[in-house]
């Protein structure tokens, strides 16, 4: 417990909260351009080829973003919308691409959980 004299000399430090998605600069989403679209393997014990894209954001950051859902149409120079949210088994992937906006089309033949994959209600 500090004395009054010690508290006068140097005040208590405020606890700084560190953001988990710094590239978004406090915005809910950011627009960006794909510079590379590729697959990476998850860490143990999982095994797959996860689809990711390297994206240059309007905030100037170059990030790795996960492409959710089955199948996609993204390639180099595709304009995408990026939101926060990490992928637990992919180290360094802290962002998701929003499906159904800009150049990223929604998932084909999706029936359930459609809003998360940019799919309109089927007729």
From Swiss-Prot:
It is found in: Plastid, Chloroplast. Transmembrane segments: none annotated. The gene is rps12-A. The keyword Transmembrane does not apply. Belongs to the universal ribosomal protein uS12 family. It comes from Dioscorea elephantipes. One of its GO terms (molecular function) is structural constituent of ribosome. GO terms for biological process: translation. With S4 and S5 plays an important role in translational accuracy. Located at the interface of the 30S and 50S subunits. The keyword Heme does not apply. Keywords: Chloroplast, Plastid, Ribonucleoprotein, Ribosomal protein, RNA-binding, rRNA-binding. One of its GO terms (cellular component) is small ribosomal subunit. Part of the 30S ribosomal subunit. PANTHER family: 30S RIBOSOMAL PROTEIN S12 FAMILY MEMBER. Pfam families: Ribosom_S12_S23. This is Small ribosomal subunit protein uS12cz/uS12cy.
């Amino acid at each position: 417990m500090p004395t009054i004299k010690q508290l006068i000399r140097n005040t208590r430090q405020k606890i700084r909260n560190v953001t988990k998605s710094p590239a978004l600069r406090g915005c809910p989403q950011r627009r960006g351009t794909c510079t590379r679209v590729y697959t990476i393997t998850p860490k143990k014990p999982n095994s797959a080829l996860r689809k990711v894209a390297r994206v240059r954001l309007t905030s100037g950051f170059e990030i790795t973003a996960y492409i959710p859902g089955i199948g996609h149409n993204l390639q180099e120079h595709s304009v995408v919308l990026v939101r926060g949210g990490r992928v637990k088994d992919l180290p360094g992937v802290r962002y998701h691409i929003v499906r159904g906006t800009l150049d990223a089309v929604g998932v084909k033949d999706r029936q359930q959980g459609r809003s998360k994959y940019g799919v309109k209600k089927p007729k």
